[in-house]
Curated annotation (Swiss-Prot):
Gene: dapA
Subunit and partners: Homotetramer; dimer of dimers.
Pathway named in the protein's UniProt entry: Amino-acid biosynthesis; L-lysine biosynthesis via DAP pathway; (S)-tetrahydrodipicolinate from L-aspartate: step 3/4
Record-annotated active site: 132 (proton donor/acceptor), 161 (schiff-base intermediate with substrate)
Protein name per UniProt: 4-hydroxy-tetrahydrodipicolinate synthase
Length: 294
């Protein structure tokens, strides 16, 4: 589907409504700086608080702006398999290139339940499916063995966004899934683990940081793929303060604040999320200035 950087793009709001004008500006910023894919309505896109009509508007506008230049992957996960399938079919109808399907949260399925969830969906769509493993938010963890089973059996499940920060799990997930199917892709779901995942044989990152610093995140991956390990490590180290600052509060609170400081969007979220504290705002101002982004 893609190698490199897929930006998990924010959803801008203004006076409680979608701000498509600011959104277009942000999408073009991503395209101009060479990102390899856009992930719309993921965690960073505040998908739980975006309604069905808004989803359609946002996905349709994204596809219009991107115009086939890079893949557009749409977040379509819920904790109901049937509701998830409904969102997948909506994305398919609109012309998305793939769907990001988070593991069912709150109801805590077993490993067999996780496998059956993805099997059910994969049998009912032709879209490429990306498994999204983020145990810190969902309460369930896709074990490397389960990821490998999915890779072996479900051919239109194209990869996994691995947001478990455990380095050992990252390594095992990459190793076992690639053994099961050589074209199965593994992307980091944590910006600060991107370099480590690449070293383990992974394929890139679905990134929050690239909302703000797309050029730098693209460079991190591109240098690695070109064999310039030291340069990639250097970019990673330079980005560390920004990576840390953008997770000073719950994502996407800091990244929206940063984009506001950069003049891209209003600093507006939907409840239960609230804007960043002044302490975080000051941290972001300083880090953005030090990074040459402000």
């Amino acid at each position: 589907m893609f190698r490199g950087v897929g930006t998990a793009i924010v959803t801008p709001f203004k006076n409680g409504e979608l701000d498509l004008e600011s959104y277009e500006r942000l999408v073009r910023y991503q395209l101009e700086n060479g990102v390899n894919a856009l992930i719309v309505l993921g965690t960073t896109g505040e998908s739980p608080t975006v309604n069905e009509d808004e989803r359609e508007k946002l996905v349709s506008r994204t596809l219009e702006i991107v115009d086939g230049k890079i893949p557009v992957i749409v977040g379509a996960g819920t904790n109901s398999t049937e509701k998830t399938l409904k969102l997948v079919k909506q994305a398919e109808k609109l012309g998305a290139n793939g769907v990001l399907v988070v593991t069912p949260y709150y109801n805590k399925p077993t490993q067999e339940g996780l496998y059956q969830h993805y099997k059910y969906i994969s049998e009912r769509t032709d879209l490429g499916i990306v498994v999204y493993n983020v145990p810190g938010r969902t309460g369930v963890n896709v074990l490397p063995e389960t990821a490998a089973r999915i890779a072996a059996d479900l051919k239109n499940v194209v990869g996994i966004k691995e947001a478990n920060p455990d380095i050992d799990q990252i390594d095992r997930t990459v190793s076992l899934t690639k053994q099961a199917r050589s074209d199965f892709m593994v992307w980091s779901g944590n910006d600060d683990r991107t370099f480590y995942l690449l070293c383990a044989g992974g394929d890139g990152v679905i990134s929050v940081v690239s909302n703000v610093a797309p050029k730098q995140m693209v460079e991190l991956c591109a240098e690695y793929f070109s064999g310039n390990l030291e340069k990639s490590r250097e970019v990673h180290r330079k980005l560390r303060p920004l990576m840390k600052a953008l997770f000073a509060e719950t994502n996407p609170i800091p990244v929206k604040a940063a984009l506001n400081l950069m003049g891209f969007i209003e600093n507006e979220l939907r409840l239960p999320l609230v804007p960043a504290s002044e302490k975080t705002m000051e941290l972001l101002r300083n880090v953005l200035k030090e990074s040459g982004l402000l």
